Amino acid sequence: MAAVKSCVEEEKIDCDLDFDKVIDVQLDDNHCAKLKAGYESLLSRGALTVTEADFTPNETAESEFFLSLLNSASTKREAKSYLARLKAQHPPKAQTEPTTGHSKGTVTQSLPSGVNLGSFYGASRSVYDSPVFRHDSTPLPPPSELPEERLHLALIKIRTPQLLDDTIINGVAKTLSQLSRLGMACCVVVDPGTAGNANTLRRVAAEQAERISIAVDAQPDSKSAHLDSVLSLSPMFPELPTVLSRKALLNPLRDGQIVVVAPIAYTEDVPKAVTISANDAILALTKELAGLAMRPDPDEDPWLTAQKIAKLQKEVSLDRVILLDPLGGIPSFRGPQTSHVFINMEQEFDDIKNELLHVQSSEACTATTPKGGNTFVEDPLERHLDNLQLSQNVLAMLPSASSGIITSPLEVSNSARTPQANPSDVSAVGTRRQRNPLIHNLLTDKPLLSSSLPMSRREAMNRRRGSINTPSSHTTFVKRGMPLTMIPNPRVEVWTAQNRPRLSLDDPSIDLPRLVQLIEDSFNRKLDVQDYLNRVNDRLAGLIIAGEYEGGAILTWELPPGVEDDGSPASEARMVPYLDKFAVLKRSQGAGGVADIVFNAMVRSCFPNGVCWRSRKDNPVNKWYFERSTGTWKLSDTNWTMFWTTPGLTENSQRFSDYEQVCRSIQPSWADDTGVVD
């Protein structure tokens, strides 16, 4: 990797990625030289203008991998965040000096560096344990067993692969191979659907598992393991499949193989193959991989049980649950958006489920449902509900850092293809390939598009992200997420100037010290708390809090200078909805979707008719604000830029003037105020 790294530095390519850290494999000199040669060719052409046709067959595999990687990391912050996670996952191994000069060195020195052959070429444990008579030295104890590295894993379900052509299957297999190279082991569960009897489904599942295995094996430096006896059914719990052997499941994953599993379980009392639902297989595998499948003895010490579970959880980290369904992500039937880009389960699960159920039961839905008595035709909304519920059930068993992705095999396959060079193109600028949602999410832990982007911005970015004919992204990123608190609750009481709440920041329902800490951490400045309370307490419109004060927004009703707050309708009509503070803890910035969660709540639930705010002209966050606002205005003779989401604001000169005067007149409340603008 040193060769590749030096190649990047020599060419002065701003690629945002430290490949020395990203490619977490130990390479021998020949492989490293091969990478250097291929990557020099890649960089000499320019990362965004090369295509598969530019490379020899020997170069293509490596160039494909790096091109996909370069394209999927869109910002330095995202790349650095991934590198930090990768570094934490794989701490440097302690170097130990050899204690003997000839006993084992003569065997291991001839092996390629980075190849772990276990005990194949070394002495077995029985040899070490055997008594040995030595003449020249004191007997050495057997070598201590080093703890295994934590396995980072993605659990993937592919629905009805029998309906997908070979091009799509090969594209999915290519992506799985790339994920594996990036340090994410993959376990694939085949879902044959429900169209057929048990025997037919079992046959289809086995055939498709073998088909996917063959496609994976066809990828360069990739190997699959088709496991057909992973799950079992106990007579005591016939409805709950369990993993028959944890070791048999994890060993091929640790060896870098992509495991493929059919939803077939074997009964324990009388060996018999039973077809189970793919969802049950996913839940059983999740429970095992999360360390929750152990059934302790009722008489066992609880502390000992906890220690055993903790040990299992240190072995494996189930980071991603990926559902590949031809229908794609979860659709949205409210608002301008057509699909949910990001779902915060803690906040949105019930609402989205009820929305899908409502549409399913409506006359419009029944009118479009296929008829004709075919009992095997599935309702698309039923499948979306199924994907939503499965994501909820799985993430409930996993740490909050784990996430889910619901997308289509077609989108994954399309983004895995290299755009072909067009002979008629004379421009030096090539078509940028579509970002792969799975690789992008691995690098960034975020969806392809921000969920707080307005619909017009999403469409524009989709057009820019792919080729001219690329369809809009329909991938849903799912997190267990965090609860969201809105005070007062806009579902109970709409936020309007006429019914302003009698609310203050020192209200018992608000943890003021944590709120102050959130603001000071986000802005990196000390707040003059009393001065701030004096300014906003009589003007509060409400408060939004994400999680345990990981993010939040303070919103007020402001009057332009010279307008008296006398409670009259004329005075209330002039009140401006104002975002006074928008804060996210530093540790939650750039990942986790905290800012999107708070912003969405503000513009969709609290102030759907519009809100305004201001920001320093040189604030690096302004790009984020620009993308989410309806309009902006640089305030002359100040260092402020005004933003708003209010439709048609510029058409109402009086309203626009009120917004501008409010943004000009607000005084900051910082304890370290030195006259520099906020």
UniProtKB/Swiss-Prot annotation:
Keywords carried by this UniProt record: Acyltransferase, Amino-acid biosynthesis, Mitochondrion, Transferase, Transit peptide
Annotated spans, Disordered: 86-111
Domain N-acetyltransferase: 499-668
A biological process term (GO) from this entry: L-arginine biosynthetic process
Family: Belongs to the acetyltransferase family.
Function of the protein: N-acetylglutamate synthase involved in arginine biosynthesis.
Designated name of the protein: Amino-acid acetyltransferase, mitochondrial
